[in-house]
UniProtKB/Swiss-Prot annotation:
HAMAP family: Leu_Phe_trans. Functions in the N-end rule pathway of protein degradation where it conjugates Leu, Phe and, less efficiently, Met from aminoacyl-tRNAs to the N-termini of proteins containing an N-terminal arginine or lysine. Pfam families: Leu_Phe_trans. This is Leucyl/phenylalanyl-tRNA--protein transferase. It comes from Burkholderia pseudomallei (strain 668). Its EC number is 2.3.2.6. GO terms for biological process: protein catabolic process. It is an enzyme of class 2 (transferase). Gene3D superfamilies: Leucyl/phenylalanyl-tRNA-protein transferase, C-terminal domain, Leucyl/phenylalanyl-tRNA-protein transferase, N-terminal domain.
Length: 255
C-alpha cells in the first residue's frame, strides 16, 4: 500500500517506493497538498511529484534514476554548428529567469508522444512559481529575434539541479537551452542534473541511469553546498565547444 501523507506527515524512506513488479514502479506516497515546503523537502530527499488533474498528488523516487553528468553532455557535429551560430549571431539570446511562468505554460502545452493532456497543471505552476520567487526554481530560455522560442525549467538547491520539463517552438531551441544550462553548471562545479526518468532523447545527449541509492547519497551532499549564482552570459557556452569531458567527473557515479 502507498501511504497517504497528511499535512504534517514526513515522507517515508525512498526504499519503500513500489518496485518494478508493481504497476507504478517508483511510486512512494500520495497526498492532498502541494505546499512549497513539502516540495522543497521532497527534492532534498530525491523525491518529485508527478500526477494528472483529478488525481491526488503522487510522489515518486524511481530506481534506477536518470541523470545527466554535465561533463558527459554529448554534442553532435550538427549541433556544434548550431551552437557556434548562436554564439556568433546577436539575434540569438539565452536568458535566465526572464519569463519563468511563460516557460512552464509552454511546457504544459507542448505535445508529448504517447501522452494525452499534461501533468503540468495549474496547481503545479503555482507551486513552482512560489519556488521561483524564493530563488529555488529557474528557467533557461532561448530567444530568437526578441521572441522566446524554447526553454526549460527546474529546481536548484546547493550544487544540484533537478530538471523538470522543456519545450521548443524552433529547431533545437530546447537543446540550446539545455546546452546553456550544462555550460553554466559546469562553470559552477555542479556534477549532476536529475532527469527523473529515462528517455531516448536524454540518452542521446549523454543521460544515463544510476542506482537510486547512489543518486540519493549525492543529492544529500550536493544540496548542503552553498547555492550557485544564476547570472548568465551566453559566451559561457563556448566552453562546451573546446573541452573534452572530464574522466574524473564522468566516473564519479556508478553506472
Amino acid at each position: 500500500m502507498v501511504p497517504w501523507l497528511g499535512p504534517d506527515d514526513p515522507f517515508p524512506s525512498v526504499e519503500r517506493a513500489l518496485g518494478t513488479a508493481s504497476g507504478a514502479p517508483g511510486l512512494l506516497a500520495a497526498s492532498a497538498d502541494l505546499l512549497p515546503s513539502r516540495l522543497i523537502d521532497a527534492y532534498r530527499r530525491g523525491i518529485f511529484p508527478w500526477y494528472s488533474d483529478g488525481q491526488p498528488v503522487l510522489w515518486w523516487s524511481p530506481d534506477p534514476r536518470m541523470i545527466l553528468v554535465p561533463a558527459e553532455f554529448r554534442i553532435s557535429a550538427t549541433f556544434r554548428k548550431t551552437l557556434k551560430r548562436v554564439l556568433r549571431e546577436p539575434r540569438w539570446e539565452i536568458r535566465v529567469d526572464c519569463d519563468f511562468a511563460g516557460v512552464m505554460r509552454a511546457c504544459a502545452q507542448a505535445p508529448r508522444r504517447g501522452q494525452r493532456g499534461t501533468w503540468i497543471t495549474a496547481e503545479i505552476i503555482d507551486a513552482y512559481s512560489s519556488l521561483h520567487r524564493a530563488g529555488d526554481a529557474h528557467s533557461i530560455e532561448t530567444w530568437l529575434d526578441g521572441r522566446r522560442v524554447g526553454g526549460l525549467y527546474g529546481v536548484s538547491f546547493g550544487r544540484m539541479f533537478f530538471g523538470e520539463s522543456m519545450y521548443a517552438h524552433a529547431s533545437d531551441a530546447s537543446k540550446i537551452a539545455l546546452a546553456a544550462l550544462v555550460a553554466h553548471l559546469r562553470e559552477h562545479r555542479v556534477e549532476m542534473i536529475d532527469c527523473q526518468q529515462n528517455t531516448s532523447h536524454l540518452a542521446s545527449l549523454g543521460g544515463r541511469e544510476i542506482a537510486r541509492k547512489t543518486f540519493v547519497a549525492h543529492v544529500r551532499r550536493a544540496v548542503a553546498e552553498p547555492p550557485i549564482p544564476w547570472r548568465f552570459d551566453k559566451r559561457v557556452v563556448a566552453g562546451l565547444l573546446g573541452q573534452a569531458a572530464s574522466a574524473t567527473a564522468a566516473d564519479a557515479f556508478d553506472r
